[in-house]
Amino acid sequence: MSFVSTPPLSRTPAEAEPAKPIKNDPFYPDVSLEHARDTIRFDGTITDARLRHELLAAIAEVNDELRSARAAWRDAGITCLADVPADQLDGESVRLQHYRRAVYCLAKATLIERYRDYDTTGDGARRADELEPQGDELRRDARWAISDIIGRPRMTVELI
């Protein structure tokens, strides 16, 4: 039996510098690719371009789900999510922490689902099957984070 190991992909010269944060709607925080990468534990196999693409899609989805809550907060004179009354942890509003969690979880879930086409060998198919529940759990975590932002109770329903 032989063992073959490949080193992690090194960043291209264009990616050698930290990627610029994603500019978000002024109500919501900008999203740092470096923070996202560190938080959701992706290695160098996910390029900045691919990560940016999935984070943009996740931001759009979360912002859309928060649209009515944002309108209500703006009607109340609140100009950004950080100003919505909330507990502070580590010097930051928990709503901001929940926002990032929702975005990061959705992005990671989508990237995990895309790994199915990355390696279609028998081992790759088994690995993809192992990751499927993780993707579902990440989507659940994102929904819970959104519920926490707007103060809606979390709910899990199973069909009997």
Can you describe what each PLM-predicted range is?
Residues 75-99:
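Short, exposed interaction segments that mediate macromolecular assembly or regulatory contacts
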